[in-house]
Amino acid sequence: MYYGFDMGGTKIELGVFDAELNKVWQKRVPTPRNNYDDLLAMLIDLVHEADAQVGVQGSVGIGVPGIQTGDEGALFTANLPATMGKPLRIDLSQRLQRDVRISNDANCFVLSEAWDAEFRSYPVVLGLILGTGLGGGLVINGRPVDGRNGIAGEFGHLRLPSDALDIIGVDIPRVKCGCGQFGCIENYISGRGFEWLYEHLYGEALPAVTIIRHYRGGEEKALEFVDRFMDLLAACLGNLLTLFDPHLLVLGGGLSNFDEIYQILPTRLPSRLLPIAKLPRIEKARHGDAGGVRGAALLHLMDN
């Protein structure tokens, strides 16, 4: 059996999967935010409860909203203060007496999609989460790419390409990102960036769902804005597609539910790519909120 944990700032979800990726048991509990020992104890109790439910000792994979840094495996994550700087993987492995694997939750999202029955034949899968920020990951031949520092897939912290300024104006503010840098693309093309950019251009703060509703209703400002936003999205994604040349691009997060993206984006991307480049297949994520636990379980299952 394969246990996948999705650890968030408010909840921890555990999903237990068999070898065919059928979910056979699950449980959700509040996250102990500030006490590391309490968090460890809760995770250990959940693992033992799952063992009792399925009658075997399952393997443990964990997706976290952060980065596992260095060879010692310390976590860097603002959303889980109890784990900041702690070697969670090492501590859990020792206490459970089994191999525990940890990866960024965006990597788990992409891994889950790459192992979907429909998508499994694609060698290179690029995933992007267009949510509050811009997360992502890369899976090659069924395995996630983490990189030396665990930051592969932190695409949101790439800078705006120069041609983006032709689309949204050279006077666009260089927003200071949470990482401390200026001009990171997640501040412009994430779900939050979608709303911020509309407010900057039109002086009116509206939620994304309202902007999209106005767009579908033919409202002039919304039509103009979405046209510019799609060009901006294509300019930013064009760099990623040229860099990784994926067979499949999967989109998740709240903005991925804007279904017109899947019709418009393929018409805007070709001008941002090399003339010989063929577009990847572009799809909405298949597994939604369940992708985190599924991908975490796959951190072990992909070995088989």
Swiss-Prot record:
Catalyzes the phosphorylation of N-acetyl-D-glucosamine (GlcNAc) derived from cell-wall degradation, yielding GlcNAc-6-P. GO terms for biological process: N-acetylglucosamine metabolic process; peptidoglycan turnover. One of its GO terms (molecular function) is zinc ion binding. Pathway: Cell wall biogenesis; peptidoglycan recycling. This is N-acetyl-D-glucosamine kinase. Keywords: ATP-binding, Carbohydrate metabolism, Kinase, Metal-binding, Nucleotide-binding, Transferase, Zinc. Zn(2+) binds at H157, C177, C179, C184. It catalyses: N-acetyl-D-glucosamine + ATP = N-acetyl-D-glucosamine 6-phosphate + ADP + H(+). Belongs to the ROK (NagC/XylR) family. NagK subfamily. PROSITE patterns: ROK (PS01125). The keyword Nucleus does not apply. It holds the Pfam family ROK. HAMAP family: GlcNAc_kinase (MF_01271). The gene is nagK. PANTHER family: N-ACETYL-D-GLUCOSAMINE KINASE, ROK (REPRESSOR, ORF, KINASE) FAMILY. ATP binds at residues 4-11, 133-140. Its EC number is 2.7.1.59. CDD domains: ASKHA_NBD_ROK_NAGK. It is an enzyme of class 2 (transferase).
